[in-house]
């Protein structure tokens, strides 16, 4: 995995990494997704293969 992008389909704070992971895979065709805190906000980030 070498490409991290904020989710294009997630709205609001990310508090459930498992849901973020599933949504990234199902809706954005990513390999993985996870919640991370950036700039004092929890966001869903999707990870894609190179």
From Swiss-Prot:
InterPro entries (alphabetical): Scorpion_toxin-like, Scorpion_toxin-like_sf
Species this chain originates from: Aesculus hippocastanum
Gene3D superfamilies on file: Knottin, scorpion toxin-like
Subcellular location: Secreted
Predominant location category: secreted
Protein name stated in the entry: Defensin-like protein 1
SUPFAM superfamilies recorded: Scorpion toxin-like
Keyword Secreted: yes
Protein's UniProt keywords contain Ribonucleoprotein: no
Family, per entry: Belongs to the DEFL family.
Function: Possesses antimicrobial activity sensitive to inorganic cations. Binds specifically to the fungal plasma membrane. Has no inhibitory effect on insect gut alpha-amylase.
């Amino acid at each position: 995995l070498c490409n991290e992008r904020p989710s294009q389909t997630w709205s609001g704070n990310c508090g459930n990494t498992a849901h973020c992971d599933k949504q990234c895979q199902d809706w954005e065709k990513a390999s993985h997704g996870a919640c991370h805190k950036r700039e004092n906000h929890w966001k869903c980030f999707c990870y894609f293969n190179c």
